Amino acid sequence: MEPRPGTSSRADPGPERPPRQTPGTQPAAPHAWGMLNDMQWLASSDSEEETEVGISDDDLHRDSTSEAGSTDTEMFEAGLMDAATPPARPPAERQGSPTPADAQGSCGGGPVGEEEAEAGGGGDVCAVCTDEIAPPLRCQSFPCLHPFCIPCMKTWIPLRNTCPLCNTPVAYLIVGVTASGSFSTIPIVNDPRTRVEAEAAVRAGTAVDFIWTGNPRTAPRSLSLGGHTVRALSPTPPWPGTDDEDDDLADVDYVPPAPRRAPRRGGGGAGATRGTSQPAATRPAPPGAPRSSSSGGAPLRAGVGSGSGGGPAVAAVVPRVASLPPAAGGGRAQARRVGEDAAAAEGRTPPARQPRAAQEPPIVISDSPPPSPRRPAGPGPLSFVSSSSAQVSSGPGGGGLPQSSGRAARPRAAVAPRVRSPPRAAAAPVVSASADAAGPAPPAVPVDAHRAPRSRMTQAQTDTQAQSLGRAGATDARGSGGPGAEGGPGVPRGTNTPGAAPHAAEGAAARPRKRRGSDSGPAASSSASSSAAPRSPLAPQGVGAKRAAPRRAPDSDSGDRGHGPLAPASAGAAPPSASPSSQAAVAAASSSSASSSSASSSSASSSSASSSSASSSSASSSSASSSAGGAGGSVASASGAGERRETSLGPRAAAPRGPRKCARKTRHAEGGPEPGARDPAPGLTRYLPIAGVSSVVALAPYVNKTVTGDCLPVLDMETGHIGAYVVLVDQTGNVADLLRAAAPAWSRRTLLPEHARNCVRPPDYPTPPASEWNSLWMTPVGNMLFDQGTLVGALDFHGLRSRHPWSREQGAPAPAGDAPAGHGE
């Protein structure tokens, strides 16, 4: 009777024992077959040991290639016993199952099994499981050579890569040792302590499997090194937090998981479906619900999962799904209707769809996480705010008090669906409304009131709109209160306010156009500023000209935060050029508009270096008008001074360049035409060479490290690993010459300059700074002394002799003009 090959790791070794006494078989082959059965029985116990680590037994035996079965069986059949014979694998792993005779032959036969038993020293006890080690499962840890079971070490090493007996770091496991001296290895990967030995085992081609230490989520399926590829015989089991489930959990964070479970569980089966993997199963619920309403597949699934009839669940799901697309479009009545539908079905399903509808508008509008405090939101909310504010401001039309109340209500309509903090947006208009009603003296309060939130105006463009409207109201109060000290406060307010209402509407409508132009390019911003400039032929439009300067303040603040000192000063040439012209036109019209335009021109011209004369003249005119105007004139000059401080960085706002968020982080000071870079900080910089480091620079340009392959790796001589990189700066150094000789194509491909601008020049010292040199800590390698980036000298260990290459005689510094050939700027 022929023995049946082991087709599963749970095979009972009892029925296969009798063929050992069969006289027709070879003497040692039944013994090898019995060892295979023992190995499979131990493999099943190994899976139970791994269950203690945190892996369920069902997950390990979900398919035919289990954790222990695939490891031990494939290692046993891949060549540990006999590499020449074809391996015999279970039918689930191979298409054709070998015959029993082939299965016995694949086990290696009697002589090979005896050799392994003799070479392995049978009778050893594993220190982990305290059982006798079967010869096919025997392994020895390197370098301590302690014997263990392979399944035990595959469980132990990922948790702690040390020998269980002597606590020595294990580089690899030695398996399949024969009497002839051949063996195989299982390297331990991802341990920096034993990386060299493990990689050497893979390069030698003896590795038949590998063990990954550390986080099992990052374990690869295979690894290649030295032309050899090693596949993991036992892949990482599906842990509770795999990458696929992490993606599902990320989606759950984006939209809460409770609404997705609601269509699938009714009133009775809520607790039964909670323990399953809900995120992966319920993620397609929202897009799949409309298809289920037409085809009838998902309602059946919902009824089965809930334990109740499918009809009520469908009746509860379909109205909510029908109302979801309008809610995603931005409506709120649909969201409330979704909540009512969920409340109506509360007896069978919890009102879980309501949070999804409540979160739809912010997700659709903001379209990402909340914007950065230094990056304004998109132009969509701003255009919506400006259109509504233009209608509200032009609606009241006549009196000043209705207009101010309209301005106070403007941010509320825009802030409710868009901004998280409405009180900040509405604070400035409310104060300006009280300033309109109080008279000429209180306008000193709105100046500070709208100046305080100025530091937060770049957080959202709605705040910018509210503050601009607040400044417009304060400007109306100041424009009416300045000359009102002489001619009475009531009459100028009645004459100026009706004309100011249309201009407030025009200014509110022009702000989004200007911001969109500034975002699109400098040309659009200049056209917007030029379109705002011709609005000042009459007296009330001097106020509009004054509002043109504060309108650039939000961009100036954000531009200053993003660009720093790199923004060109010529970007602000257009606003100061428009300010003197408006100043001349307004000065010919009335004294009040002259004072306001002079304040605006002084604030705009002080922010540009090219219009300093206009700044001084406008500042003198503003001081003269404030002294002549009395209290109202002093308020106007104070507000002009406040806006001068706010718009002192304004010229950079007209030409934003690229993402402002990263400009400051990537900026660096370069030596060259900048006057500040020519004078570094004085003093000697001491560079001590690193002793005991043997490294070489490999002449292999890395194209993926730099654009043109100007990056060379620095290799450690002991391990061959890349420890650092060298980036070339020009084509004249010794490293560049060697690289050009080794790789001629590099000189044609590189974009490096012929000579670097910040090249090292010889020192210019009248006498050697012996006092500084004597204070150096001297090493046998020698010190290199630099002064402001210039090599001063390298010191010998036995004396203070300068050895820099530009010395004419030993120990004497080179003169100033003795620069090396080819290094002149």
Swiss-Prot record:
Auto-ubiquitinated. Residues 658-667 have a biased composition (Basic residues). Residues 552-563 have a biased composition (Basic and acidic residues). Its EC number is 2.3.2.27. GO terms for molecular function: DNA binding; ubiquitin protein ligase activity; zinc ion binding. Residues 479-491 have a biased composition (Gly residues). Residues 1-121, 221-312, 325-683, 803-825 are annotated as: Disordered. InterPro entries: Znf_C3HC4_RING-type (IPR018957), Znf_RING (IPR001841), Znf_RING/FYVE/PHD (IPR013083), Znf_RING_CS (IPR017907). GO terms for biological process: protein monoubiquitination; protein polyubiquitination; symbiont-mediated disruption of host cell PML body; symbiont-mediated perturbation of host exit from mitosis; symbiont-mediated perturbation of host ubiquitin-like protein modification; symbiont-mediated suppression of host cytoplasmic pattern recognition receptor signaling pathway via inhibition of IRF3 activity. Residues 273-283, 290-303, 350-367, 380-394, 402-439, 492-510, 519-540, 567-641, 811-825 have a biased composition (Low complexity). Residues 1-10, 456-468 have a biased composition (Polar residues). It catalyses: S-ubiquitinyl-[E2 ubiquitin-conjugating enzyme]-L-cysteine + [acceptor protein]-L-lysine = [E2 ubiquitin-conjugating enzyme]-L-cysteine + N(6)-ubiquitinyl-[acceptor protein]-L-lysine. A zinc finger (RING-type) spans 126-167. It holds the Pfam family zf-C3HC4. Residues 46-57, 242-251 have a biased composition (Acidic residues). Residues 368-379 have a biased composition (Pro residues). Keywords: Activator, DNA-binding, Host-virus interaction, Inhibition of host innate immune response by virus, Inhibition of host IRF3 by virus, Inhibition of host mitotic exit by virus, Inhibition of host RLR pathway by virus, Metal-binding, Modulation of host cell cycle by virus, Modulation of host ubiquitin pathway by viral E3 ligase, Modulation of host ubiquitin pathway by virus, Repressor, Transcription, Transcription regulation, Transferase, Ubl conjugation, Viral immunoevasion, Zinc, Zinc-finger. Evades nuclear antiviral defenses triggered by dsDNA viruses. Acts during the initial stages of lytic infection and the reactivation of latent viral genome. Prevents the antiviral effect of nuclear bodies by degrading host PML and SP100. Prevents antiviral response to viral DNA induced by IFI16 by degrading it. Additionally, inhibits host IRF3 nuclear signaling to prevent interferon production by the infected cells. This is E3 ubiquitin-protein ligase ICP0. It comes from Human herpesvirus 2 (strain HG52).
